[in-house]
């Protein structure tokens, strides 16, 4: 996605990757892996133990990520992967344990995400991923990421179960929706920040739908490869891709200088 027409340099190492094809590819792989691994753990061991493991992994991954002074591919994508696992568990727990319908949980998660964005913008006056170059901004960023995973999980389950679309049809639908912000940005000039976060949210149900389609039994409309097998395969793919990114540094952008949007006629600009 393109940059802003007006920017100002702000000192501080970028703590997130450049938004390229590699970003979206690995992001979708992590969403699929998070769905498969979460379901595998919850159905294989005690659900409370599984959630505990997911929560511990989430905390450890974020601690490692916040300890980094700049974007490092392995630590960043490890954090995203653990957010994918734990975020899935949180959304599933809301439905299974609290018996919250998928439609309502989607609305609740959307409200939570809106709240995160509102507070983030209130403090930082921007929601741009290009501005994530301080610990506080990164904290808001990860809060938003976790909320997008929870919301995306609920939306994906709603399409598959409540709307009775099934996994493959849901995956195809979300693939089309995922392309909308890119087309809207190129054709209609949709704002970069809105386009980015719209696409980011959709990656969750997109990846999860395909992961479920690959892993669930034939009786549920899947290919029956097994959730564990799918989780392992996706994890291997993520490790290989992230290793390439770490070695090539092809996704490191403007290290040491972050770009913030500037509107000369207004006090702030999203």
What are these regions (language model features)?
Residues 1-270:
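Polytopic alpha-helical membrane proteins, predominantly small-molecule transporters/carriers
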